[in-house]
């Protein structure tokens, strides 16, 4: 579907906007006057003049290079943009089980969604965003990226890889011989939203212990009412996207 260029001067690209944190972030940014380009496999429930949705399978590299790439090129080419944001929220936690039993094809699928697509999006926005517009990038992380959880090797290691990709991009910008790139206002955040009440949590609680030995932890989160609504991390993320000067790279967790 053809779209006109937005009148808003702030553009955010958010993946996984059909539920959970991604949906909450998109709605909050729209309330704050952003134009939001959402990307997800399923249709979006958001109905707002400032929102447009691209249905895309982030594991399909070819689809990234067609409709999503062309729309990003059109949006980021607008000279009226005063701020650009990227929220890499979409993730596939679906490959569970011990390392010795993981299927390499499913591993490739998980890493395509959780690592390859976010890295491609980061590079695309650095390359195409107006150099005078502050660029803020948020990569959603997880406790499983730093702590081992039995049964979550694929998900945790993919999130650890995304964390390192963000750090590497920040180091590249700081060390580049290109003074124009080095002096740009680009900041990256690796953000751990904590225990959020999302479909992913419910899905983890439903798994058999043989597949997810750490299932009891997710059951405890619900039983002890430790789950927070998606709007809580959404506020943190929106605040970072709207922040003035920030460190090139930082890590934060909900409530810190």
Spans of features found by a protein language model:
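N-terminal Rossmann NAD(P)H-binding glycine-rich loop of SDR-like oxidoreductase domains
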Residues: 18, 26
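Conserved glycine-rich Rossmann-like NAD(P)H-binding loop of the short-chain dehydrogenase/reductase
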Residues: 32-47
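Rossmann-fold cofactor-recognition segment
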Residues: 49-62
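Conserved NAD(P)H cofactor-binding loop of Rossmann-fold oxidoreductase domains
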Residues: 87-96
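Catalytic Tyr-X3-Lys loop
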Residues: 92, 100-119, 162
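Conserved internal alpha-helix within the Rossmann fold of NAD(P)-dependent oxidoreductases
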Residues: 117-122, 146, 237
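Catalytic loop of short-chain dehydrogenase/reductase
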Residues: 136-182, 192-195, 205
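C-terminal helical subdomain
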Residues: 182, 186, 190-191, 198, ...
